[in-house]
């Protein structure tokens, strides 16, 4: 047990206060939290109450950090979890912050996958998109659902346009038709298009039988 002898607003951050128990600095926390907890000068406080306040303050800091992160750029749950862990927040605190954001639909892997696919389809095939989303922690169920909605004809049209542009650049530098075909094929593969799509487009553009 101890007596709160002083509550001082921090000079560098007016939203936080320093709390002194029995004349000694004991902890710092969010000013609003102090108000909500009904803590004031001359209040009696024990060590368990202090631990709970510090724990709740850590959650507030974690939540605010999470909010700032998703305000800058939308994240998957894994990306945000990793970001918060890098900042030193404990797993239980991170879990609470993530649940808070999910409750207000500020963190939604399904929505993220939809937006990511829509954006990347302008320049990438489904394979590259798929593996990028896997690295970002999107679940297999979400991936299967969202990738199945991709229009194959539209994807192939995009692949052809990208290949045509690349082909016009390559043919100015490469006179060997076999090498040209191989370079174009590898380019399309690197963009995430499947073998059959790449093979068909290369044959169509180069009008030859150099593809194996």
From Swiss-Prot:
InterPro entries: RecX_HTH_1st, RecX_HTH_2nd, RecX_HTH_3rd, Regulatory_RecX, WH-like_DNA-bd_sf. The keyword Protease does not apply. Transmembrane segments: none annotated. It comes from the Bacteria. Modulates RecA activity. Belongs to the RecX family. This is Regulatory protein RecX. The gene is recX.
